[in-house]
UniProtKB/Swiss-Prot annotation:
Helicase C-terminal domain span: 241-386
Annotated effect of mutating K37R: Partially complements a radD deletion mutant for survival of ionizing radiation (possible loss of ATPase activity), increases sensitivity to UV of a double radA-radD deletion
Protein name as catalogued: Putative DNA repair helicase RadD
Positions contributing to Zn(2+) binding: C384, C387, C411, C425
Species of the source: Escherichia coli (strain K12)
Region of interest (Zinc finger domain), residue spans: 376-425
Length: 586
């Protein structure tokens, strides 16, 4: 059988060849689920001059990648205990990570290219099996090239797996294993051009879980204990949900149900017809799992329930209904789940997506790379005033799309000098100034990036202020603006309110150029909801008219000066141990 690469697959191959002709640095290709990564891998392995090792984390992917290479009329070795083959001397070897890592002695020969499928699984731990393999192969050949392929280059708890994107944006930091993303294809392109089945999403407002009270852990993920606790409170809902899924499934061939926890999954499968449903969890023995997957693909039963174990490396094209009964913490994970139902199959016209968890993700939205925050936040485009780069941040818009707030910190654009050295644009949308040198630092920085001065921790500052008899600390719940004139000219008064009713104010004069510049620096810049986008004003009345574009601080610290309180510190973007206004803490 001869395969003709689709245009985007050829572009991915060309991008790889061009990159490795000019660079030795590790690179990654981002292709959505169903884009045919196996064919791209096969073509690259065919074109490579030296030996190639292709790694995958499950035997199904090893077999799939090997089959596509064989379909080109070429022979290759397989090194995977799960496939009962351990060959390692051919020009091209397809191996499972576990088997190769345990048998590095069998890989003493030199490889010129290492390809890692589902490369987002590579951990930072030097003792991980991926890192052991990479270290070993690099010792044998210091000029080894590394290429990764994935549909999800951003992982919660880990961040971006690469540093620079070929569209000119910075993603990860210098610790990222892959330096460059050299090619990326959006999901929308695949669906628009008929390479994937169109999804038909139905939000299920009548019966759905409410996970809004859940708080993600520091790694961005929800804990299983918290999920089980919420599900127990809402256990009466599950039978109604399953009943509705079965109604929708009556005309469907394959149904995948994504549960929140193992306990939840067992409850779900108990509500489905026993002869027509199966459950796969991380604890399912390998042999049993293989049989279940084979029977599901052969359509011997309709419902397959799982807990986040079939989000990658699983190919069942007949699936035409995806039911999501778990909160998904990122756009990437949501796209992975939905992607299980988007492969083309005979007679399949769409894939029904039933979301019973109120997930706020847009299937076509770009991955922003930071936690979404509030559910009404959306990806917004913000141009850097310094370099002009079009950043994508979380933000808020009006109904007509007008930007009213964004949460970007630093421009994501990068430059390359004549020597090929890359540097990120230094413009910061939100920052805190160093008290010693006035350099702008990230709002979470502990030390100044210019002079290394230790920056004041907001918690320490608030704690110290609370001890002082002549200090007032406001847990700020709002602010109001008032303007007027006197013999010295125009002024603007800002009053900050504590949730308990106390208030403190500050006043700015706006008559001279120096006064107006000070007002811009001391008030407009820290208070604007849209940093980087100038607030147009001539008079104080213009400021009042745009008050909706200004934010109040989280805390205000004032000191007594004579008979009046004088504002000394304002704390924004606070994340610490003190409660915010109107915030409930257990």
């Amino acid at each position: 059988m001869i395969f003709t690469l689709r245009p985007y697959q050829q572009e991915a191959v060309d991008a790889t060849l061009n990159h490795f002709r000019r660079h030795k640095t590790p690179a990654v290709i981002v292709l959505p689920t169903g884009a045919g990564k196996s064919l791209v891998i096969a073509e690259l392995a065919r074109l490579a001059r030296g030996r190639v090792l292709v790694l995958a984390h499950v035997k199904e992917l090893v077999a799939q990648n090997h089959a596509k290479y064989q379909a080109l009329g070429l022979e290759a070795d397989i090194f995977a205990a799960g496939l009962k083959r351990k060959e390692s001397h051919g020009k091209v070897v397809f191996g499972s990570v576990q088997s190769v890592a345990r048998n590095l002695d069998a890989f003493q020969g030199e490889f010129s290219l290492l390809i890692v499928d589902e490369c987002h699984r590579i951990g930072d731990d030097e003792e991980s099996q991926y890192q052991q393999i990479l270290t070993h192969l690099t010792k044998v050949n210091p000029h080894l090239r590394l290429l990764g392929l994935t549909a999800t280059p951003f992982r919660l708890g880990k961040g971006w797996i690469y540093q620079f994107h070929y569209h000119g944006m910075v993603r990860g930091d210098e610790k990222a294993l892959f330096r460059d993303c050299i090619y990326e294809l959006p999901l929308r392109y695949m669906i628009k051009h008929g390479y994937l089945t169109p999804p038909e999403r139905l939000d299920m407002p009548v019966v759905q879980y409410d996970f809004s009270r859940l708080q993600a852990q520091s790694n961005g993920l929800f804990s299983e204990a918290d999920l089980n606790r919420e599900l127990k409170k809402q256990q009466r809902i599950t039978p109604h949900i399953i009943s509705q899924i079965m109604e929708f499934a009556a005309t469907r061939k394959g149904v995948m149900i994504f549960a929140a926890t193992v306990e939840h999954a067992k409850e779900i499968v108990g509500l489905l017809p026993a002869e027509d449903a199966a459950l796969i969890t991380g604890d399912t023995p390998g042999a049993e799992r293989d049989v279940l997957i084979e029977n599901f693909k052969a359509q011997r039963f309709r419902y397959l329930v799982n807990v986040a174990v079939l989000t990658t490396g699983f190919d069942a094209p007949h699936v035409d209904l995806i039911a999501i009964l778990r909160p998904t913490e990122s756009v990437s994970l949501y796209q992975q789940i939905v992607g299980r139902g988007l492969r083309l199959a005979p007679g399949k016209t769409d894939c029904l997506i039933l979301d019973y968890a109120g997930n706020p993700h847009d299937l076509y939205a770009p991955e922003v790379g930071t936690p979404k925050g509030k559910s009404d936040n959306v990806p917004v485009q913000v141009f850097c005033p310094a370099c002009g780069f079009a950043n994508t941040f979380w933000g808020k818009t009006t109904a007509d799309g007008t930007l009213i707030e964004h949460f970007g910190r630093r421009c994501q654009g990068w430059f390359e000098d004549d020597d090929g050295h890359r540097e990120q644009c230094d413009f910061r949308f939100r920052f805190k100034n160093c008290p010693q040198c006035n350099a702008e630092n990230d709002i979470a920085a502990r030390r100044c990036r210019e002079c290394d001065t230790v920056l004041v921790d907001p918690d320490d500052m608030l704690k110290a202020a609370l001890r002082l008899k002549d200090a007032l600390v406001l847990r700020c719940s709002g602010m109001s603006l008032q303007h007027g004139h006197d013999e010295k000219g125009e002024w603007l008064k800002i009053t900050y309110y504590d949730e308990d009713g106390a208030d403190v104010s500050e006043r700015f004069r706006l008559q001279t150029p120096a006064q107006r510049t000070a007002f811009e620096q001391l008030f407009i810049r820290p208070h604007t909801r849209t940093p980087g986008i100038p607030l147009r004003w001539i008079t104080a009345a213009d400021i009042l008219a745009q008050q909706a574009l200004l934010r109040h601080p989280d805390f205000v610290v004032a000191r007594m000066k004579g008979q009046y309180w004088q504002v000394r510190e304002k704390v924004f973007d606070y994340e610490g141990r003190f409660r915010l206004a109107h915030e409930l803490r257990g």
